């Protein structure tokens, strides 16, 4: 008799769990966007990359702007293996970096769709540009990685034109450096 009562209670418990899951749905916890406002005094860096259309390695280029609390840099690479064509660095102060990070936060730099199906930008918008928005730890690993394209694809939810211009203005002669790069 005791077995029947235990079995009955387990069955009722399972029914309640199934009903709760159906009503509330099964979902993974929502990841909160990073708060960059506290990162100006750390080794955290932010990076914006323009990945040109898919083409022969000899004509493919990336423009990478990296900003940290001591310097900003622009790297032009050729091909798909990160071969550096040019690199220029500029001094950055903690105060300037603090304001820059705040501007990025206001314009949604850390907002994106975390759907795993959208995690990898490679191959998307093959004939257009891919824009990659990253927050990097002091060791260089991705803390956050979002992307958009000229084909209106991607998982980045921030203000694309403002974010791009904010990064470009961290490089004093951005226009002359990138003028001859075919994107």
Can you say where each PLM-predicted feature lies in the sequence?
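Residue-level signal for well-ordered alpha-helical segments
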Residues: 27, 42-44, 77, 81-86, ...
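Low-complexity, flexible helical/coil segments
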Residues: 81-86, 100-102, 110-114, 147, ...
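Extracytoplasmic/periplasmic/luminal assembly and interaction segments
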Residues: 49-99
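Short, internal acidic amphipathic alpha-helical interface segments
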Residues: 95-129
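Short, well-ordered, aromatic-rich surface patches in folded extracellular/luminal domains
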Residues: 2-7, 13-55, 117-183
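Short, surface-exposed linear patches
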Residues: 68-70, 112-114, 155-158
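A signal for specific C-terminal beta-sheet/loop modules enriched in small/flexible residues
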Residues: 86-106, 155-163
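A mature extracytoplasmic/lumenal domain signature
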Residues: 78-80, 104, 137-139
